[in-house]
């Protein structure tokens, strides 16, 4: 082994040992960081854990004053390790059942509208009719089979057959997946028209309703869908995502809403609207009224009509879908956008001013009162704490602005127990305190205080911003652990230590083949039959199989490792030093 390789291995071993130490301090380190930061800015510290999640900011003063006050309201609001005596799971189920009850009332109201004697439509009814026409023009009468197949895929999450640890698509290709009775015809059609091995484990109308952690006040309810249902749901979601671009709505790009939130905070002409429990409030009746019959039938075929709760009880859904369904995000974006555009049209406003990203809605400020009325009629609840139509503050898609100034806070979400946890918090503090490119001296003292809790090697190991949080953000030029190879500089970062997972070879090859088919074919899946593959297509598929590689699956061990990454080119003069007739480059001198 060369001296260079030996040196690198020695440094890696030192850094690895440092990364696997524990941060030992008395009390709650996360709360200590938050309180010291507040004191540095002249704010009163938190007196209790309850205050951390209940403090409300004042929407006045200068941008700098508001930025600090807003940070106090947000920094610990999503922390998940407070001991408040709240049964967060029970709170989540209470909200879940309340949303179902509201959807039932909405279904009854929308299916039996109460027209007046002169048959004048209310604002809500008028918007439904206008939105229906807009949606039909945008998405057509029925979803395209070719379009759906182009977007069909397995996600990386859990299904009713596979738990999260076996969520990778290769496991889903290897194992039979469940489907609902109405989705069975889609699976059988796919089996008859493709070369993939399509197997069904169970035919059941149920999905699995579960909770996942959210914060110290409540959990979040989601639904785990049958595998084949999710496969086709994502196909429908992909079609809707493509069609929404015709309205200037790109669900792959949050920066559109972020830029417009900035504009609204300056001009006050645009409002940001947020909804409470948006995905759990889309009733069946609303979808039937808004969507073309062909589309509504397909959505009904692919949804799970019932859910099984952890206690074994069963709920028959009054909503079209929930968080966890493969088309929920795109469908809610379509519905909110169509209603908002209809409101703007009724008020003689430019409907192209409406942009949507899920339940983050931006539209002209003067349309907000009417939109609230329409949303109330169709069963949605406006989140008044996160809806802003007046004043200098706007928030959308994770960016927050006050009079045009970026006041986006950072969050401490989890307990700090490892150097990696502390590095993440310190990096977020760095980004928040250097928003204008220069360290705020008030925050810098707090940063230096808590950086000392890291092992010395990790204090000196720095990487440029934008390369993740595997090391402290800083100048790579002063990193003593950086290595140069040619013109590339490599720096060590902390990564999760993983081990290869045992996997089914069949599923691995099928997943790789499927991915290649999607990337190399205009039609998505390789089909067969009278209108499917000919001999040339079959030869192409055989070639894909020959080039396929087993998918590598790994799992985290709970420990940390060190990996060198290329972070930048070396900064050297692009010329040499003349020595007579010879030129010696500076990096060789």
Swiss-Prot record:
Signal sequence range: none
Magnesium in keyword set: yes
Outcome recorded upon mutating residue 137 to M: Complete loss of infectivity
A GO term for molecular function: nucleotide binding
Effect of residue 133 to M: Complete loss of infectivity
Phenotype for residue 78 to A: Loss of RNA polymerase activity
Impact after mutating residue 241 to A: Decreased initiation of RNA polymerase activity
Impact reported for residue 350 to A: 95% loss of infectivity
EC numbers for this chain: 2.7.7.48
Cofactor: Mg(2+)
Nucleotide-binding listed as a keyword: yes
Binding site for Mg(2+) 1: 274, 359-360
Effect upon mutating residue 549 to G: 50% loss of RNA polymerase activity
Cofactor remark: Binds 2 Mg(2+) per subunit, Ca(2+) is used in crystallization to prevent RNA polymerase activity.
Binding residues for Mg(2+) 2: 274, 359-360
Effect of residue 357 to A: Decreased initiation of RNA polymerase activity
Impact reported for residue 164 to A: 80% loss of RNA polymerase activity
UniProtKB keywords: Magnesium, Metal-binding, Nucleotide-binding, Nucleotidyltransferase, RNA-binding, RNA-directed RNA polymerase, Transferase, Viral RNA replication
Residue ranges that the Swiss-Prot or TrEMBL entry lists as coiled coil: none
Domain RdRp catalytic: 259-391
UniProt-reported outcome of changing residue 130 to I: In strain: QB_ancestral, QB_1, QB_2, Qbeta_1_FR and Qbeta_2_FR
More about this protein: In order to produce high amounts of RNA polymerase catalytic core, a fusion protein consisting of tsf-tufB-replicase with a cleavable linker between tufB and the viral replicase subunit is frequently used.
Known role: This is the catalytic subunit of the viral RNA-dependent RNA polymerase complex. This complex is involved in viral RNA replication that produces (+)-stranded genomes via a complementary, (-)-stranded intermediate. Binds RNA cooperatively with the host ribosomal protein S1.
Subunit structure: Homodimer; the replicase complex can dimerize. Part of the viral RNA-dependent RNA polymerase complex, the other subunits are the host ribosomal protein S1, EF-Tu and EF-Ts. S1 is needed for the initiation of genomic RNA (+)-strand replication.
UniProt-recorded name of the protein: RNA-directed RNA polymerase subunit beta
